């Protein structure tokens, strides 16, 4: 059974916890600010594989708070970044989160494969008071090699489920790519060792 670790991030009041609960239970819980971090578990079958999905929901943070994401970057295989389409400040916070996730690829937290990231514009049911355009979200995702979608945790149970399946598929694709690179690296090392020691054997 494959373990898939997913972290859901976003500013306070964006509905990230509501998205998780909607996916796990099909119910909409409304919005609340949690002072506790939670890890949810779900077993599912996807692409013929049995998966143990762990979803990490950190405690709500004010959007102006400083954040490092160091532990999340080391733990998670992928990220869902949530903003509220009716709150421009939440979009700015989502942008900062994406920049932070992408930045480590060239520093201390370098990975063989870039983390899967899905940017989600939540509360599509509030489009009459929209402050962030669809095009803005799409461009931010495109510029930072992320997937993108808009939806409503309050009204769209199926869309929420498909959103999570989408990021999980991206993570599984990354697993295959890592394994392929690991196998290719092992073959290259074996060939190098054979070349070095093979030549020595011939010269003896």
From Swiss-Prot:
The organism's place on the tree of life at top rank: Eukaryota
Keyword Hydrolase: yes
Enzyme kind, highest EC tier: hydrolase
One family name in Pfam for this protein: Ras
Catalysed reactions listed for this entry: GTP + H2O = GDP + phosphate + H(+)
GO molecular function terms noted in the UniProt entry: G protein activity; GTP binding
Keywords: GTP-binding, Hydrolase, Nucleotide-binding
Keyword field contains Cell cycle: no
Binding site for GTP: 10-17, 57-63, 122-125
Enzyme Commission number(s): 3.6.5.2
PROSITE patterns: RAS
Region (Small GTPase-like): 1-204
Family: Belongs to the small GTPase superfamily. Ras family.
Function, in words: Binds GDP/GTP and may possess intrinsic GTPase activity.
Name recorded for this polypeptide: Ras-related and estrogen-regulated growth inhibitor-like protein
């Amino acid at each position: 059974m494959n373990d898939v670790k997913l972290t859901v991030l976003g500013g306070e009041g964006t509905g990230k916890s509501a998205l998780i609960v909607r996916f796990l239970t099909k119910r909409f819980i409304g919005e609340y600010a949690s002072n506790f971090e939670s890890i949810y578990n779900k077993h599912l079958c996807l692409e013929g594989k049995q998966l143990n999905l762990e979803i990490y929901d950190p405690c709500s943070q004010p959007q102006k708070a400083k954040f490092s994401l160091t532990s999340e970057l080391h733990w998670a295989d992928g990220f869902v970044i949530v903003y509220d389409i009716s709150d421009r400040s939440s979009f700015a916070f989502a942008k900062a989160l994406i920049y932070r996730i992408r930045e480590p690829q060239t520093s201390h937290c370098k990975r063989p494969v870039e983390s899967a990231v899905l940017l989600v514009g939540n509360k599509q049911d509030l489009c009459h008071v929209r402050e962030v355009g669809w095009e803005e979200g799409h461009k931010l995702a495109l510029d930072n090699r992320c997937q993108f979608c808009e939806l409503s945790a309050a009204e769209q149970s199926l869309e929420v489920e498909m959103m999570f399946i989408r990021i999980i598929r991206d993570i599984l694709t990354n697993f295959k790519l890592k394994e392929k690179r690991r196998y290719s690296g092992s073959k290259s090392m074996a060939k190098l060792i054979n070349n070095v020691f093979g030549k020595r054997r011939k010269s003896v």
